[in-house]
């Protein structure tokens, strides 16, 4: 799928070397179709890495997407230059009068904090409330999923005894579900987190469907029945070496991390790590764009505000 982004974005050159179709405004203007508007709230510290990971997967279906990046104005990034943020990102006040067909909320390295102690929490809360009437389908990832469940349903996150890090199997639970079209009965994906949610709380506090789970990871992906909200606790978007970089970063910082499970051959960190989830990732993101966004979003964006949804409320 062609994605329309600022041609100066550093990710563009990387994507073009991978034969991924990106277009600028001039070329996009000659396509006589309405593009889908996708907003990405990027809360990850390595902004450019996450941009490339997500754009790589969003460029996987034959639909034109207009991508906007959003950042929390109440938080100052320590790892990405302010020039990059000012050039390629928008603030919430700049987008709050717009409508979007889809939104992705990434993870964030703030699991150790209570939600209310995150410095951008109030801004995040306002943005999530706004999304109910201005975004058709929202895909929450990792901490973004935990935060969304907490704000909307009061589902808590719980500290795990040790970090969950590695490539883990999950079973698909709803045969024929649109988000898992083309999937086998089971698949693997990266997980990297210190906290988890309670399946019992999800069942007792929400009307969300649990779509996949695994023995090590617990609940992995759940969604409202109308696919207006989707929660994924893994990282299908990760590159081959993302978990390795996290491991070496933590090791060099003196944290004595566990070697990511099912990742390095024979647990030898000098080996090239496996890549065994890319086809599942491609399918998942394509299914989200095609079935949750493209086939359901109204042609007139303003009707999103009038399109009432029960979401996952009981």
Swiss-Prot record:
GO biological process, one term: L-methionine biosynthetic process from homoserine via O-succinyl-L-homoserine and cystathionine
Main location: cytoplasm
Record organism: Streptococcus pneumoniae serotype 4 (strain ATCC BAA-334 / TIGR4)
A Pfam family it matches: HTS
Example GO molecular function: homoserine O-succinyltransferase activity
PANTHER family according to UniProt: HOMOSERINE O-SUCCINYLTRANSFERASE
Phylogenetic classification of the source organism: Bacteria, Bacillati, Bacillota, Bacilli, Lactobacillales
NCBIfam families the UniProt entry points to: metA (TIGR01001)
Name of the protein: Homoserine O-acetyltransferase
UniProt-annotated site: Important for acyl-CoA specificity, residues: 111
Intracellular or extracellular location(s): Cytoplasm
Binding, substrate: 163, 192, 249
A single GO cellular-component term on record: cytoplasm
Pathway: Amino-acid biosynthesis; L-methionine biosynthesis via de novo pathway; O-acetyl-L-homoserine from L-homoserine: step 1/1
Matching HAMAP family: MetA_acyltransf
Keywords for this protein: Acyltransferase, Amino-acid biosynthesis, Cytoplasm, Methionine biosynthesis, Transferase
Family: Belongs to the MetA family.
């Amino acid at each position: 799928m062609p994605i329309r982004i600022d041609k100066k974005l550093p990710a563009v050159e990387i994507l073009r070397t991978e034969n991924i179709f990106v277009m600028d405004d001039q070329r996009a203007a000659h396509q006589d179709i309405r593009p889908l508007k996708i907003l990405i709230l990027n809360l990850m510290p390595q902004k450019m890495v996450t941009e490339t990971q997500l754009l790589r997967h969003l460029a996987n279906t034959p639909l034109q997407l207009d991508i906007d990046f959003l950042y929390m104005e109440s938080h100052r990034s320590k790892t990405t230059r302010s020039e990059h943020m000012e050039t390629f990102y928008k603030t919430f006040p700049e987008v709050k009068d717009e409508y979007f067909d889809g939104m992705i909320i990434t993870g964030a390295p703030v699991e150790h904090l209570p939600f209310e102690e995150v410095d951008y929490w109030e801004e995040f809360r306002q943005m999530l409330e706004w999304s109910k009437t201005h975004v058709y389908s929202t895909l929450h990832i990792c901490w973004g999923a935990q935060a969304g469940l907490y704000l909307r349903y009061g589902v808590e996150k719980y500290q795990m005894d040790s970090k969950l890090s590695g490539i883990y199997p999950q079973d698909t639970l709803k045969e024929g579900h649109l988000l898992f079209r083309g999937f086998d009965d089971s698949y693997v994906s990266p997980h990297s987190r210190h906290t988890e949610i309670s399946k019992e709380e999800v069942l007792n506090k929400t009307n969300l469907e649990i779509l996949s789970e695994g023995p090590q990871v617990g609940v992995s992906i759940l969604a409202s029945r109308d696919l207006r909200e989707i929660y994924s606790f893994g990282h299908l978007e990760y590159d081959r070496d993302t978990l390795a970089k996290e491991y070496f970063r933590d090791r060099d910082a003196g944290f004595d991390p566990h070697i990511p499970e099912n990742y390095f051959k024979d647990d030898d960190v000098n080996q090239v790590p496996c890549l065994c989830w890319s086809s599942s990732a491609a399918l998942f993101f394509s299914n989200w764009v095609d079935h949750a966004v493209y086939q359901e979003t109204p042609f007139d964006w303003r009707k999103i505000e009038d399109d009432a949804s029960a979401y996952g409320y009981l």
